Amino acid sequence: MKSKALIVLGIALCLLAVSASIFAHHGAAAYDMTKTVTIKGKVTHFNFVNPHVQVFFAVTGDKGPEPWQAELTSPNHLVRTGWSKDTLKSGDDVTITGYRTKDGTNSIWIAKILLKDQELILATE
């Protein structure tokens, strides 16, 4: 009976550990959600994949193009608003408004995106 209790306890602890990491992944802790920034750039790559769609783009800075990365919600959410793997293409000019990472790296969580001055509708989680 004692060994069954230990097995159940072990399984419960494993499930607890896994669920904590899942919730941590979906948090916005890395982003400063108190300040929005707007950045203009040119799409270099568009990953329409789970768990989050990614947009890689170049921003022209004082020292030439700087690589940036932006995240969106899941493809499933975006499909519901008309997005597809072809919504953004390499070379597209975009204006992205969102929340930059707290550590200052060139990464942003997208709140709004303009493609050729047309706002793309985003699905929220």
What name fits each language-model region?
Residues 11-12, 22:
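Cleavable N-terminal signal peptides
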Residues 23-37:
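Short boundary/loop segments of OB/S1/cold-shock single-stranded nucleic-acid-binding domains
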Residues 80-95:
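Short nucleic-acid-contacting surface segments enriched for D/E, G, S/T with interspersed K/R
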Residues 41-43:
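Conserved hydrophobic positions within beta-strands
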Residues 49-59:
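Short aromatic-glycine-enriched beta-strand elements
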Residues 1-10:
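Bacterial N-terminal signal peptides that target proteins for export
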